[in-house]
Amino acid sequence: MSNKMTGLVKWFDAGKGFGFISPADGSKDVFVHFSAIQGNDYKTLDEGQNVEFSIEQGQKGPSAVNVVAL
């Protein structure tokens, strides 16, 4: 599943390097790891930030990939 989606960052713990995104379509919150964030800056997200992402099935369930801040 590589369809691009948008959503809001529900929360992100920069110290632990992960958080969750609430998809705009109302589907279940999606796990996001800092390594999935695109960009050259410090890879973190802010609560309430708009993002675009795709979903892939990981070992522990669906996770966001190719996350881009909007």
Curated annotation (Swiss-Prot):
PROSITE patterns linked to this entry: CSD_1 (PS00352), CSD_2 (PS51857)
SUPFAM superfamilies according to UniProt: Nucleic acid-binding proteins (SSF50249)
Record's keyword annotation contains Repeat: no
Subcellular location: Cytoplasm
CSD domain ranges (all copies): 7-67
One GO term of the biological process aspect: regulation of gene expression
Keyword DNA-binding: yes
InterPro entries listed in its UniProt record: Cold_shock_CspA, Cold_shock_domain, CSD, CSD_CS, CSP_DNA-bd, NA-bd_OB-fold
Annotated Pfam families: CSD (PF00313)
Highest taxon above the source species: Bacteria
An MF annotation (GO) of this entry: DNA binding
GO annotations of cellular component type: cytosol
Keyword list, A-Z: Activator, Cytoplasm, DNA-binding, Transcription, Transcription regulation
NCBIfam families linked: PRK10354.1
Cited PANTHER family: COLD SHOCK DOMAIN CONTAINING PROTEINS
Protein name as catalogued: Cold shock-like protein CspB
Source species of the chain: Yersinia pestis
